[in-house]
Each structure stands twice: as C-alpha cells, then as structure tokens.
C-alpha cells in the first residue's frame, strides 16, 4: 500500500471531487464550439487520408519502336475545310501527306456553328466522292493535262491529276473552270460554297516516337525535289487568315491531374498570312494507379513564335499553324500510393489534444475573467 501511495505522487492528472466542480454556460458554449471544430477537422483529416498521394520518379527513357498518339481538336473560324491540309513528318524521313485517316474535318459557318451534323472523313490516299458518276466514263480514257504532260504523267483523268501535273510544272492553278475534269467534278462550286466558312479539325494522329512536326496549312501539300511544299498559287496571301482556337491538344492518354498547357488557347492573327509555330517538349510519362493499372502517356511544355510569311517557300515560311515537337530522353514515373495510417492516427490525436488544450485555456480565461468582474461588482455594492 505504501508503494501505491508513492506511485500516486506521479499522477499528472489529479481529480477533484464532484461537489467542487462548477459548470457554467460559458464552459458549455466553449465545449459545443470546440466539439464542432474538432468534428470538422477530423472529417478533413479523414478525407485527406482517403485520397492517394503521387510519388514522382525520374528515369532514362529506354522504350523503343513505340508510336506517339497526338490528340487534336482545333478550330479555324476563317479557314474553309476545302482549303486546309494537315500534314505530319518526322526526322526519320517518314512523311504523311494530307493526313486524315484518323482525323475529321467539320465545316463551320461564319458564327462558328456546324454546317451539318456529319463530319467529313477522308482516308489517306482514298479518292474523294465526286458529284458525278465515275462509272459513266470510259475506264481506258486518257484525258488531256492541258500542256502539263511529263514523261511519267501522260494522262489526267481527274481534276486532282491536272492539279498534280500543274504543281509538278510549277504552274499556277488559277482557273479550274477552263478544265473539263474540274468542271465535271464541281471543283469551283465546292470551293465557292466554303469560301466564307471555318473548319474544325479533330481526331488523332499516330506518328513515330521521334522528333517531328505536324501542321495545318492552306493549299494541297506535295513533294517537289524532296522538299515539302504547299500549292498556294491559287490563293491570295492577303486572304489567308490563320486565326485559330486550340480546344484540346495532348500527346497520349489523360491521367489524373494532367495539365495540357495548350488547351483552350485562342490566338487571333494580327494580319493576313501569319505563320504560328509551337515548339513543344514532350516528356514520356508512366502513371501507375493504386489498383495496378499502368498508363503510358506524355506531358509537354510549349513556347510560341509567330511571324508574317510573305513567301510561298524558303526562309520566309509558309502561312499556317505548325507544331514542332521533341522528345525528352528522360521519363517521369508517377506512382499513386495510399497515405500512411499512422500519420492519420497522429493527425487525429493532434486534433483532439490540441482542441482540448485550447478549449481548456479559453474556458479558464472566460471563467476567471467572469469571477473577477463579479467580485468587483459585489465590492461596489457593499460600499
């Protein structure tokens, strides 16, 4: 018993008799308020614990032979779909001209609304649907190229064949109405119908995972002496307005928390025949979810440059929107992990202990202040 008596001396929490305890309205108010605050802080801590945290790691990218998926949704309010070409090429030498096999073009009116609910989809290398029945023509015919014949081009049986022959010669294709093939296919009518329209380009590209570029530019694209050029001879440079709105642009799949810096970018061309260049640095990214799902995607940063393209070729540039991308040799690995349960318990204990301590100090201050004031009032009454 004597040992127990000595042990009691170490009690840091001495108890008072129930008869000596005083309950006040101020103490009740402090208890209720502190209890509510404690509950709110606990719920906040619980919500934080239930979320996952992401741990970033940096590695050398050792992947080889992969494809790079580029998601695109861009609006050109003053560039008709019939005038616009989309091309992609990489430093490996692979060039995909007029790439549309995974892209759609949707015609827009002058107010930005779709002309029709259906979008145009053109397969790469696929002949477009004509306004006449091609079966009505002799399949063995050999029509004129109107003076643009070459050794490898003897016959021009379509408007596109004539345009190609003219481009090979370097001639301007200015008056398609004088060419029977174009008049038969309604080429001028198609161009005139879309003259004051805009165009929405959306879909995705799949390119080699090496540095390269893709661009949106007016005129038909083609190769001339191993150089990529666009036929702008039938366009007036003063009529080319490359104002654009990038609704979405990303490289790969989205993951939680991703930021695509070009999303919702609206750029107004200050004058005609502008060349916009976006220099993009792509960082390969692997995102691992807590359930084991692995997303292989990319992040990117970007800078923009713009200038007036006064020429059709050469150093003066080409009117259009160009996205030039490079791939980083480093890869970012983002791993989702559950938060530590011990940290959660520590936080809850800190909340409870801290609130009890602060509430006790406030209650003591209120109680002793009220007693001091009451004593002064009582002394005033006796005198």
Swiss-Prot record:
This is Endoplasmic reticulum-Golgi intermediate compartment protein 3. Residues 1-25 are annotated as: Required for MARCHF2-mediated degradation. Belongs to the ERGIC family. Residues 47-341 are lumenal. Glycans are attached at residue 266. It comes from Bos taurus (Bovine). One of its GO terms (cellular component) is endoplasmic reticulum-Golgi intermediate compartment membrane. The chain crosses the membrane at residues 26-46, 342-362. Forms homodimers. May form a heteromeric complex composed of ERGIC1, ERGIC2 and ERGIC3. Within the complex, the interaction with ERGIC1 is direct. Interacts with ERGIC1/ERGIC32. Interacts with ERGIC2, the interaction is required for the stable expression of both proteins. Interacts with MARCHF2. Interacts with SERPINA1/alpha1-antitrypsin and HP/haptoglobin. Signal peptide: none annotated. Keywords: Acetylation, Endoplasmic reticulum, ER-Golgi transport, Glycoprotein, Golgi apparatus, Membrane, Phosphoprotein, Transmembrane, Transmembrane helix, Transport. GO terms for biological process: endoplasmic reticulum to Golgi vesicle-mediated transport; positive regulation of intracellular protein transport; retrograde vesicle-mediated transport, Golgi to endoplasmic reticulum. Pfam families: COPIIcoated_ERV, ERGIC_N. Possible role in transport between endoplasmic reticulum and Golgi. Positively regulates trafficking of the secretory proteins alpha1-antitrypsin/SERPINA1 and HP/haptoglobin. It is a multi-pass membrane protein.
């Amino acid at each position: 018993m004597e040992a127990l008596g000595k042990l009691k001396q170490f009690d840091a929490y001495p108890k008072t008799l129930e008869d000596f305890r005083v309950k006040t309205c101020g103490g009740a108010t402090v208890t209720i308020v502190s209890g509510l605050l404690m509950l709110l802080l606990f719920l906040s801590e619980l919500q934080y614990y239930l979320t996952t945290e992401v741990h970033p790691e940096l590695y050398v990218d050792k992947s080889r032979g992969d494809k790079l998926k580029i998601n695109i949704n861009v609006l050109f309010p003053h560039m008709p779909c019939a005038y616009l070409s989309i091309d992609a090429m990489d430093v490996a030498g692979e060039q995909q001209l007029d790439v549309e096999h995974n892209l759609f073009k949707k015609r827009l009116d002058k107010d930005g609304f779709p002309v029709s609910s259906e979008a145009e989809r053109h397969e790469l290398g696929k002949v477009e649907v004509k306004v006449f029945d091609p079966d009505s023509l002799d399949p063995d015919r050999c029509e004129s190229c109107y003076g643009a014949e070459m050794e490898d081009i003897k016959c021009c049986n379509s408007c596109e064949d004539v345009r190609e022959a003219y481009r090979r010669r370097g001639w301007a294709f200015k008056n398609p109405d004088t060419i029977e093939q174009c008049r038969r296919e309604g080429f001028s009518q198609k161009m005139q119908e879309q003259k004051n329209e805009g165009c929405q380009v959306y879909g995705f590209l799949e390119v080699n995972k090496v540095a390269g570029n893709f661009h949106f530019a007016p005129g038909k694209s083609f190769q001339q002496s191993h150089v990529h050029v666009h036929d702008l001879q039938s366009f007036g440079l003063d009529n080319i307005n490359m104002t654009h709105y990038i609704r979405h642009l990303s490289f790969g799949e989205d993951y939680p928390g991703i930021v695509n810096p070009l999303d919702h970018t609206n750029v107004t061309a200050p004058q005609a025949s502008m060349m916009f260049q976006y220099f993009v640095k792509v960082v390969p990214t692997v995102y691992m979810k807590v359930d084991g799902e692995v997303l292989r995607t990319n992040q990117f940063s970007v800078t923009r440059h713009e200038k007036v393209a006064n020429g059709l070729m050469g150093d003066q540039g080409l009117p259009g929107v160009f996205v030039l991308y490079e791939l980083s040799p480093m890869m970012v690995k983002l791993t989702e992990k559950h938060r530590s349960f011990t940290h959660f318990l520590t936080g809850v204990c800190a909340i409870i202990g801290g609130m009890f301590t602060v509430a006790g100090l406030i209650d003591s201050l209120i109680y002793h202040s009220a007693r001091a004031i009451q004593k002064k009032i009582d002394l005033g009454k006796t005198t």
